A protein has these predicted regions:
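Hinge/cleft segment of the Venus flytrap/periplasmic-binding protein
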Residues: 224-249
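Short helix-capping segments at alpha-helix termini
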Residues: 74-79, 118-120, 186-187, 233
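Secondary-structure end/capping motifs
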Residues: 148-233
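Pocket-lining segment of extracytoplasmic ligand-binding domains
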Residues: 10, 90-93, 98-187
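Predominant activation on well-ordered alpha-helical scaffold segments within soluble catalytic domains
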Residues: 13, 69, 113, 222-225
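Short, hydrophobic secondary-structure boundary micro-motifs
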Residues: 24, 176-178, 236-238
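Short, glycine-/small- and polar/acidic-enriched structural segments
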Residues: 1-88, 92-97, 101-109, 125, ...
């Protein structure tokens, strides 16, 4: 139904390993995580050690549970030291109303500027500094059949995406104007100042000195496969070649 999709790196690994889905990543959109552990500033939570005895809201996923477990063990604590509560999609409101002390799963480029816009002071930290391997927040993917039969079409898409990213770097305000002019205002209204901050946060994470936009490495995929297998998130080990492909220039 679609030639190209956007998905999360760990979800790609799970889909291939646990369900046998015939897909592969063809390029990384963001070179590092955007998902964070977020809290209001007065909670004084700046690392996993500060989560001991605290209540943390999450979206009910096994991935978030494994991340918390790994982080807590990394700092010498235990997952049972944290009270995890499934709050569904109410990550922000559960925190601002005081129902939880922190949340895991909010995005640094969305919920942080949104909360700051609403007048809240916040603290946050990334999980990948605490036993979690670095990962790509989102990737472009295609099904294996198309990768085999129409690689030139996919290469053309990646070239166009890279051109769009270059335009974004050169004229972020102009690109933001396109976003604002095409927003779904009725169902998902956007705030100009929030989206400006979001772009400022996102832009430097989409490429690094060593990794241009769309770069993905076998090492990053292998580290995530190994961690997910160790954490019980996947039923069997998969090869890097099962989940990613380098289409070349």
């Amino acid at each position: 139904k679609a030639e190209i999709g956007m998905y999360y790196q760990q979800d790609v690994i799970q889909a291939v390993a646990n369900q046998g889905t015939k897909i592969k990543s063809i390029g990384a959109i963001v070179q590092s995580p955007l998902s964070i552990v977020l809290s209001l500033k007065d909670k004084n939570i700046t690392s996993p050690s500060d989560l001991v005895g605290k209540t943390v809201g999450y979206g009910g996923t096994a991935l978030s549970e494994s991340i918390v477990k790994t982080m807590m063990e990394y700092v010498g604590a235990d997952a049972s030291d944290v009270n995890l509560i499934d709050v569904g999609f109410d990550l922000m409101s559960s925190m601002t109303t005081g129902n939880v002390d922190a949340t895991i799963g909010c995005l640094v480029n969305h919920e942080v500027p949104q909360l700051e816009e609403e007048g809240f002071d916040v603290n946050y930290f990334m999980a990948n500094g605490y036993g979690i391997p670095n990962y790509y927040e989102e990737v472009f993917l295609a099904n294996n059949e198309m990768i085999e039969s129409e690689p030139e079409v996919l290469k053309g898409f990646l070239r166009a995406s890279a051109k769009g990213f270059e335009d974004f770097k050169k004229d972020p305000d102009g690109c933001l104007a396109i976003l604002m002019n095409n927003q779904n205002e009725e169902n998902f209204p956007l705030t100009q100042s929030v989206e400006e901050k979001s772009c400022e946060t996102l832009l430097p994470l989409m490429e690094t000195e060593d990794a241009p936009f769309l770069t993905q490495t076998e090492e990053c995929w292998q580290e995530n496969i190994d961690w997910m297998l160790e954490s019980g998130l996947i039923d069997q080990k998969v090869e890097v070649s099962d989940v990613m492909v380098d289409l070349g220039e």
